[in-house]
Amino acid sequence: MEPYAILYVTQEIEYLLKDSFLPKWELDGIKDLNTLWLERGRMACDTYAIGKIEQWSVRQLRAHRFLFISTKRKIRLKDCTISPDIFILKKELKEYDMKRFETLIGRRRVTLRKSFGNMLRAYAFQHVTVLHGSEAETLSYADPKRHVVKGQPKAAPMYDHPDRWWRDVDDGPTDKKLVSMLDYIIYSADEVYYVGCGDLKTLEQFASRDRKRFDRIKWICIDPIAPETSYANVKVVREKVVSARDLKHYLMRDEVERLLIWDVSADGLKGTIEWEKQRFKEDRNGENIAEALCADFALALIKHRIPEESDEYICRSSWLIPQPGAPITMYELRNLMRLDGYSHVERKHIPRAYARKIDAEVARRLVEEYHGEDVGRLLKRSLYEDIHIERADGLTDGDERTRADLFYLTNMRNVAFMHDVYRVVEKSFISTLWVSNRQNFTYDDVPVNRNFITLRFSKKNRRVLDGNGAILFLMWQHPKDFPKTMNYDPSWAENYAVIFYHALTSPVPDLSLCRFIGLRLMSSTLRINSDRAHQVTDILKKLGLDVSGHLFICLMSNSYVADLDWWFRMILEWSVKDREGKLAALSEAKAELIEWRDEKADEPWHIKNDLLAALFEFIYFAKHFDINERYVESWIQYLRNA
């Protein structure tokens, strides 16, 4: 069974649901945890929920995959007040019909996916050095002085490879041209020398957009018209730069990564031959100064105006790239030059700047293909990734530093190398595997069986959880770093298994371990579709013996990712306590439950032999899931030795 969502809507939205074909779940009559769990388990598709939820905590509702939809800015729960995951302005609600409402939900849920990914990256950033399979989101949160961001991003459009130019129908507008330029180029720079900075409005707009990145850079802004500024990290120099000597004496410390931005454009009579020559000279002068100071700068980004009267010309360049946010009438590229100065990032995939002949017609076509004020968002992202992500195949990279492998291992291109994928998971500090069989229109991931992951990867101090469980675990264990009020889509998160290192201080059955939602539904489904699935377990129970139904159905249904080391320790160490002992351990660990039967509280939930019986019975079925019996037998041995 796939992880379907509960779409909770507040009262003022309920009237829309009359036209929905999805089920509607009334919550008002539910009084206890177990009833909530049992009723939730009957739902085998996305379901709307209405009614009172103040008696439940946010983690309990997230465990049931609740998404909160409201026109209210805040929703009150048992333990906190949260912002809705999907907010609708009340004055706009009257314009919605069911189709528009559900379209909005679909679009907003896509944006919520990023929140899940960012939370996993935040945990990774705390513990690892190398991040594989990286995209723009990784760069945006990485510390270039501490983290090595590796991957194989799609090549950005550039002059050299017109055969690889691409367009995307999902593209849209981005920031203004120069703000976009700063956004994609400054990633790892300690010092930026901005020659031709103008009136500093570009810098101010970028500071307003991303103050954290702005503040970590020392800016040297050089332009005769530059005004004074109150920014402590900005030095203004009101001079012209006409030679390398003019710039050299402003270079400050050693062993820092420096970036040169050259955006010099003097006044002239537009359209004249003299103006064309002046523009050409200014751009070549920027290249010459960058080359003369090549030992001081890691990168230079030079203004590159395409001559109107020339078919071919010579420049010094690594890449000629289009400009996100530039008007389609602006026949100007940016010239990226990789130089020899110190850099935090390995950029061997970018050729060292060299003198080269440029075909002006190809350069103009590059402008016409990518410039325009209604496009540029994906171009900027692509440039950002292509310039700053170190090229490496995560499956073969020999870097032995602590690593993270998020959101790429189960891509279609790795399907022939699953042995290497599993080897990477074994050595990675945190990794993800796609486990869902639902249709995925966004990514080309191939699912891995949940029961295989459950049996293969769990061990002491290594957690194996679905993505929702991983987030709930981090909220439980690290509430300051991962507040429980954070917005994310729990059902989307459960499309992934997350395997990560984290010690377990207390083996209590916190709801992050596994929720087993729909377990009884899956058990009934197996029973009515097979004469063999329950045969042996039924006989054992008639003989007065017991089998862990949770464990058996978990493995047989292939619907759940569970941490067996934690689970078995919970049964052997916590479940044997009496009611008071159980509750005391839960209280001390600040854990929360998703199911609890008070009438059984003094009894063990199961004993070792119940777990062994479930594993022995599953061995018969393991071959149907292409699971080697040794992975089951290793857990049988684990229990025998416990």
UniProtKB/Swiss-Prot annotation:
Annotated InterPro entries: Orbi_VP4, Orbi_VP4_C, SAM-dependent_MTases_sf
Q: Which GO terms describe its cellular component?
A: viral outer capsid
Location (main, coarse): virion
Write down the Gene3D superfamilies for this protein, in alphabetical order: Orbivirus VP4 core protein, C-terminal domain, Vaccinia Virus protein VP39
Is Zinc-finger tagged as a keyword?
A: no
Domain of life per record? Viruses
Q: Which UniProt keywords apply?
A: Capsid protein, Outer capsid protein, Virion
Q: Where is it located?
A: Virion
List, alphabetically, the Pfam families matched: Orbi_VP4 (PF05059)
User: What family does this chain come from, according to its entry?
Assistant: Belongs to the orbivirus VP4 family.
Q: What does this protein do?
A: The VP4 protein is one of the five proteins (with VP1, VP3, VP6 and VP7) which form the inner capsid of the virus.
Could you identify this protein by its name?
Answer: Core protein VP4
Q: Which gene encodes it?
A: Segment-4
